[in-house]
Amino acid sequence: MKRFSKFLIMAFASLFVFANAYAQDLGEATEVYNNAATALSEGNDNDALAGFQKALSLAEAAGEAGAQLATECKGIIPKILVKIGKEAANAKDLDGAIAKFKEAIAKATEWGDAETASEAKELIPLIFITDGNQLLNEKKFAEAIVEYEKALAEDPDNGMAYLRIGMCKNQLGDAAGAIAAFEKAMTLGQEANAKKQLVNVYVKKANADLRAKNSQGALDNAKKSLEYGENPNAYMIGGTAAVALKKYDDAIELLSKAKANANVNYNLARSYEAKGNSAKACEYYKLIAADAKLGEFAKAKVAALCK
């Protein structure tokens, strides 16, 4: 009986020491947590992060008694990681920013903070796009494409990345690649911006065809450009090409919408004359009668047609 009583005393003593150790862990965890909260309020984010991480470790060591404090730490650590990542990005430390965002994603996912994980995931491709934009502004188009492709590796449905890739490829003379990128961007929330870019791509192609005396190519690309939006140059190039092809209905339709100048008026006059509409031809020849280059020819036409 004495031996049994001695065993109980020893057992109770062990429990007291064990419980006391838990209490000490929780007390220290609470103190560290409060210090971390103070650091955070003072803008010392790195000190705050280290403090909350230590408080979490101590709270978990305290077992069930520290469960609530551990939950509090898990709720704030991913958010601090995102905040530090943003600060790194603002300081142009892009690698450091991405590392913090990825750490935030891992912790937030592990601890069930879907909102913070989602925010961090959205920020990573934005970092690559920002870097790409800097290179684009410096006319380092190939290097910029590399950064935009990194953004797509993180977010395959990033319409802005496709839009910027298209802009870079257009500058590099890769019209086919630019068109493919812009068409993809159109399906991913960048329709208006992508259409503006496609207008320019096809106008550029049409102008190159016109200079190369490929009138059919110039007309086709000008019309393709106009499928995406209005452009005065597309009307002028397409109309000029149509005159060369003797497609006078197309010429009149396009040139009537082009910005008026001597060449546009001349080609409209020719087109109406070819269609047998002397009155309209005369109207446009009169508009260029005073032109230094076309005036004498126009005056002769006016004399012949305007009776």
Segments the model singles out, each with a brief description of its role:
Residues 69, 73-76, 83, 120-123, ...:
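Canonical tetratricopeptide repeat
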Residues 55, 104, 151, 184-185, ...:
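Canonical positions in the second alpha-helix
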Residues 29, 63, 71, 78, ...:
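Helix-start (N-cap) detector for alpha-helical repeat units in TPR-like alpha-solenoids
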Residues 60, 109, 156, 189-190, ...:
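Short coil turns that delineate tetratricopeptide repeat
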Residues 2-4, 20-86, 90-91, 99, ...:
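N-terminal leader/linker segments that initiate helical-solenoid repeat arrays
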Residues 41, 83, 90, 130, ...:
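Register position in tetratricopeptide repeats
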